Amino acid sequence: MRWLNLLFLIFCHGLLSAQCVSVSGFVKDAVSGEALPGATVRTMKNATIGLTTDGNGKFLWTANQSDSLRVSFVGYEDAVVVIGLACEIEVKLTPSFTGLDEIIISSERLIAEEFTMSKIKKLEIYTNPSAKADPLLAVNALPSATTTDESANISLRGGSPNETGIFLNNVPINDAVRYGQLNGIGTFSIFNTALISQVQVYPGNPPLEFGNTASGLIALTTDEMIPTKAIHTVSASLASVGYYTSRKVGKGAALTGFTNFQPSGLLRWFNPVALERIKRFNTVDLGVHFFSRLSERTALKIFTYANRESFLFDSRTPTFRGNVNQEKARSYTVTNIRHRFRNSELSFNHGLSFSRARFSQSTLDAQLDLTDFYTSLNYQYFGTKLEIKTGLSYDYRGSNFEGKFPRYRYALGEQFPVDSTASRQAIRLPELYLYGKINLTPKWIAGGGVRKGISTNEQSGFLSSQLNINFRPTKPWNFILSMGRYNKMVIPQGISAESTQIQTDQYSLDVSHTKQHLESALSLFVKDGQQGDQQTHLRGIELYGRYRIHRNLRTQLSLTSLRARQTLKGETISSPFDIRYFIRGNAEYKFGDTWTATFVFLFREGSFYLPVVGAHFNSSVGAYEPIYDRQARLPNYSLIDFSFSNLFAVGKNASAVAFCGLSNVPNFKNVRDYTYNFDYTLKTAEYYALRTIYFGVVVSF
């Protein structure tokens, strides 16, 4: 009997030892395997008790063997798990759509996907303080980004923003920025992050399945999720109030709508010094997205968007100090239809866009109307080793500019002479393309293609071509060699009345090494271009490293160096992107299960400008005309940002993320340009954004 009692005690001790004080859990997408941060975990006994997963999709639960947990996440089916004796549990949530065929046609894969360098996920856009929850600003955090003006006009690897192609669902989006000036520079993009599922970035050698792109390419894709129940999201921050909803319509369709209002009052009140020059801004936008699986193999996607914005800021020039007013209204619609055959796919893409912008500053009073029409038909074959994609496209871009403007750039006051102009220009660009990719061996992939621009009455034809090679000798290593010639027709805007062609020759070698905790990459690239009489020559190198020190701490560091020259009429000077170093990095720390703190920095060499060394008084005009010296560099640029966020449950069926960001924490005075007094004897520095605070909350239910 004593032996039985002893065995019983040993057995009970084993059971007690097997029960964990706490249980660690991991929640992920059942299809893609990706972690799901912000998923809600609650006990079945009491729905008011719960927590949310951290930024890695993990959670820690105080163990109780009898506990049953309900795990939920917006856009996914709920899952119920019993803890039992497990110390670790993995929860797979199924996306809210049904049927294997539906999953097969749920997204369109780029044929040149193996030659991409960067993919940005939705969560990365929200958690990066430099991105300000904007998809295009998130691109500026990449090592390949060489944007120097803190705007959403993206430069990649030293290319002009005019050379960068931006596509939404395979349709080019021109003028994709808000608060844009007459020169095209804009502060934010027009894209709603809540609707974007992924951003793919080609820093150079853009795939020729996309047309009219001369340098880098940014491809955005909207979500194709069909929720089983209605999804609602309400957001509020210092500069915006928004509402987003998505619901299932019929058997296999989803209808999504959103609207945002962005006033400037609160943001300016919290940041009176940093935003001293901004008098007012506001935006109202509305978007509707419809996705339908018309059949097991056919999908339809329609997205329409409209916005109205205004921007008033203080301008200071030698001959005028006063307000600059900008107003703009625009709308666009993107339609996609694709049908999947057994080993191939046929797709049709269409885009239509209209915009009207008005600018006024002293005697400048101008209106710019832009019209874009795009359509393409594509066929893609999926073989075991060979993939081929071919198609044709037609791209129309029209510009209508009229107004009055100062006759002399240095005489902007109302007392100086003005000229009036009216111009109407357009480009019509039909193109044919063919791209093929072959898996030579399990380690080698080769791709290549051509794209022919057909000549019209407005412009001559051109031929673009490229070659890509991907080599994976072992699992952690990846080598990508790319080269090609690319062409782009630039739409005329503003006073400029002639469209121009940009042609670039590019060569790049990208090497990456990825292990469990360490990612590293090296890129070497060469780019030679021509636009009109101007030639550009660029050489560059990128170094990148990303290391997870432990479960809660991740760091990233990159160095980009550019040597860029431009030649015009026999004279060679440094280009605006001749910058010897961009040093950027970040550190992300997760604590308390749901809190995340992020530290971001950027240091770069100052860009070039033309200093004024004197002035000549033009008596016929009544103003001083500046005399410029040779190029000089602005002071070096430094930026440090900090943000933190918290994921938490709200009530029984909702979750929220609260965030707060502080930009330019040390309040660096980064010089953007210089302004002068009337006779150019006194110089004053103009600065980029000073220290700025921004916070808000997003609630999903």
Per-region residue spans from a language model:
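C-terminal beta-signal and adjacent terminal beta-strands/loops
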Residues: E605-F617, L639, S645-F701
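Short, acidic, small-residue-rich periplasmic hinge/interaction motif at the N-terminus
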Residues: K28-S32, A39-M44, S72-Y76, G84-N128, ...
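Flexible loop and strand-edge segments within Gram-negative outer membrane beta-barrel domains
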Residues: S264-L267, E276-F281, T298-Y374
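Periplasmic N-terminal accessory/gating domains of Gram-negative outer-membrane beta-barrel systems
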Residues: E77, C87, L110-T164, N170-P206
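A beta-strand signature from Gram-negative outer-membrane beta-barrel systems
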Residues: V91-K92, F188-K229
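Short, acidic Ser/Thr/Gly-rich low-complexity loop/linker segments typical of extracellular
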Residues: A47-K58
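Gram-negative outer-membrane beta-barrel transporters
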Residues: N439, F525-D528, D533-V613
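Membrane-embedded beta-barrel scaffold of Gram-negative outer-membrane proteins
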Residues: N349-G351, A357, R472, T500-E542, ...
